[in-house]
Swiss-Prot record:
<comment type="similarity">
    <text>Belongs to the PurK/PurT family.</text>
</comment>
<keyword id="KW-0479">Metal-binding</keyword>
<dbReference type="GO" id="GO:0004644">
    <property type="term" value="F:phosphoribosylglycinamide formyltransferase activity"/>
</dbReference>
<dbReference type="GO" id="GO:0006189">
    <property type="term" value="P:'de novo' IMP biosynthetic process"/>
</dbReference>
<protein>
    <recommendedName>
        <fullName>Formate-dependent phosphoribosylglycinamide formyltransferase</fullName>
        <ecNumber>6.3.1.21</ecNumber>
    </recommendedName>
</protein>
<dbReference type="InterPro" id="IPR054350">
    <property type="entry name" value="PurT/PurK_preATP-grasp"/>
</dbReference>
<feature type="binding site">
    <location>
        <begin position="156"/>
        <end position="161"/>
    </location>
    <ligand>
        <name>ATP</name>
    </ligand>
</feature>
<feature type="binding site">
    <location>
        <begin position="191"/>
        <end position="194"/>
    </location>
    <ligand>
        <name>ATP</name>
    </ligand>
</feature>
<keyword id="KW-0436">Ligase</keyword>
<dbReference type="GO" id="GO:0005829">
    <property type="term" value="C:cytosol"/>
</dbReference>
<feature type="domain" description="ATP-grasp">
    <location>
        <begin position="115"/>
        <end position="305"/>
    </location>
</feature>
<dbReference type="GO" id="GO:0043815">
    <property type="term" value="F:phosphoribosylglycinamide formyltransferase 2 activity"/>
</dbReference>
<keyword id="KW-0547">Nucleotide-binding</keyword>
<dbReference type="Pfam" id="PF22660">
    <property type="entry name" value="RS_preATP-grasp-like"/>
</dbReference>
<keyword id="KW-0460">Magnesium</keyword>
<feature type="binding site">
    <location>
        <position position="283"/>
    </location>
    <ligand>
        <name>N(1)-(5-phospho-beta-D-ribosyl)glycinamide</name>
    </ligand>
</feature>
<dbReference type="InterPro" id="IPR011054">
    <property type="entry name" value="Rudment_hybrid_motif"/>
</dbReference>
Amino acid sequence: MDSFKFIQKKILLLGSGELGKELVVEAKRLGLEVIAIDKYENAPAMQLADHSFVINMNDKKTLINTIKKIEPDFVVPEIEALSIEALKELEEEGINIVPNARTVEITMNRHKIRDLASKELNIKTANFSYVFNAEELEMKSSEIGFPLLLKPLMSSSGKGQSLVKRKEDLLLAWEDALKNSRGKIEGVILEEFLNFDYEFTLLTVRKSSGENVFCEPIGHEQYKGDYQCSWQPLDMNESLINEARNMTNKILNNLNGSGIYGVEFFVRGKEVIFSELSPRPHDTGMVTLVSQNLNEFELHLRAFLNLPIPKISLLKPSATRVILSEKESINPSYTGLNEALEVENTKVLIFGKPTSKKGRRMGVVLSSDDDLNIARKNADKSASKIKIVS
């Protein structure tokens, strides 16, 4: 690729959170121009981008007009709260959507990705059923059985998800799901509650050649569907890893767009069960900032820019622990940073979000050690020192 033309590449980031911020860091290292968009001012990625705009990305006309005005070489969605119709129309006009508009549409909707995996590709998932009105709730929940998970068909970061243990709690969970739903679809998915042994993310890079390249599995823990900690590598049976890779190949060969994908699985005994997929850097994959020779943000850029991707190797066992806010505040400040940074082989990332609220992810601790257990303990210890204050 001609280096002068490459330097002139312009990337438009739709969504400007902490994952987008790290993508901007890597893009600027390659001399790229980055424009960041979000629904609020001073979002994390905006703080590093060349230019930024605040718009309603769910408004089709606004999103189309903004993208046409900017004239980017690549449009890179970092969130799911956006107009898919706008992306589809722009792609038809020749604008590069990463990885492609169809993939963004399928993966943002639990109905579409579950049907693709389970019904079309015959990939094992938890038992599930869709519900589009409250009258169907009791009947379909009895078919799944209690306890069950109730999730909006469109949401992210665990918003609107409930563990329902009895039918008396169904209506409340239904209302919470609809309140936290994104997009125009008013419906939920009921899922069998799996008594799984562990869950993991398989970061997978799809090259423009169609080759899929796998990172080492990343173990993670969630609370109400939201990531709390992760670690790499995950000690698991090679046959289970191969099964997850085979499932991932099936899905990505169907979606067929270049970039990095975070593919989530459950393991129950000798079963590997597909959970979800994100066509972008994954929150659990922030561990790769210290664990791998090429982190997930570098890999995403290299893939959709069609740049070389040499062998991905593990540098050292590593772990993360998120820093959560316990209160609401504007322009939050932090205590305990000195104590957190005293922990050996540990880094602290403060995302720079302009406001905090209870349970909001405000930062993450990264830790590495030859002993994975020590890395995990150090990440937990460091994160526990930091408190968000007004």
